């Protein structure tokens, strides 16, 4: 075989992992089952033909007597639950140590100070775990007044930088992201992703 194509439906969980409480999840979590229940079914005939409905009882997804694909659920060996950890494991990389998250407190002041120093951005706003749409709305006026980037994280191991590209050029945002990536690597802080949010 010359090539394999892997299609991932990211964040479509089908039940909790045994270590769910280590990552502040509840044992009852099941994204697909809850989406099916909320919508009173789900019209996914091709996934049903592949055997998706045979994994569990999902409202509106039929069981397939003769599926055209292989189906099942998997349990990660890696220590972690974020997108990157799962994708890396599918490619054969098992992480013994989870990527660092900053969900409870935001990033330590030393990291923020180092980011400000390396980028010469003058300061940052937010520095908390937040929904991207909400944090941008909450800090929009202050962002326009100061031109400081909005820096935030989530439940995943991410350092996200949001700016209004009418004020801060897109190329500057990308440069700041490259600087942040190198900074985390230099400091030995295992942050999975640095994300630009123009």
Residue spans for each PLM region:
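Active-site neighborhoods of enzymes that stabilize oxyanions during catalysis
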Residues: 154
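Active-site nucleophile/metal-coordination loop of metallo-enzymes that catalyze phosphate/sulfate
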Residues: 11-147, 157-164
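Extended, H/D-rich, highly charged conserved domains that either
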Residues: 157, 163-198
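Generic enzyme active-site microenvironment
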Residues: 8
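Hydrophobic faces of well-ordered beta-strands that scaffold small-molecule active sites
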Residues: 149-151, 194
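Extreme N-terminal starter segment of soluble prokaryotic enzymes
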Residues: 1-5
């Amino acid at each position: 075989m010359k090539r394999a194509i892997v299609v991932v439906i990211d964040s479509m969980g089908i039940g909790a992992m045994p270590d769910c409480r280590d990552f502040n999840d509840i044992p009852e979590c099941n994204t697909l089952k809850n989406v099916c229940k909320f919508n009173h079914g789900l019209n996914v005939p091709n996934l049903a033909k592949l055997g998706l409905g045979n994994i569990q009882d999902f409202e509106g997804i039929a069981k397939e007597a003769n599926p055209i694909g292989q189906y099942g659920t998997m349990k990660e060996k890696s220590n972690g639950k974020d997108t990157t950890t799962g994708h890396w494991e599918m490619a054969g990389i098992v992480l013994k140590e989870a990527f660092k998250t900053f969900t409870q407190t935001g990033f330590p002041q030393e990291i923020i100070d180092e980011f400000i120093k390396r980028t010469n951005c003058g300061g940052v706003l937010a520095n908390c775990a937040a929904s991207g749409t909400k944090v941008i709305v909450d800090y929009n006026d202050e962002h326009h007044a100061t031109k400081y980037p909005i820096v935030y994280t989530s439940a995943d191991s991410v350092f996200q930088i949001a700016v209004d590209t009418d004020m801060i050029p897109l190329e500057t945002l990308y440069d700041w992201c490259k600087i942040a990536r190198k900074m985390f690597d230099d400091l030995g802080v295992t942050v999975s992703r640095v994300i630009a949010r123009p």
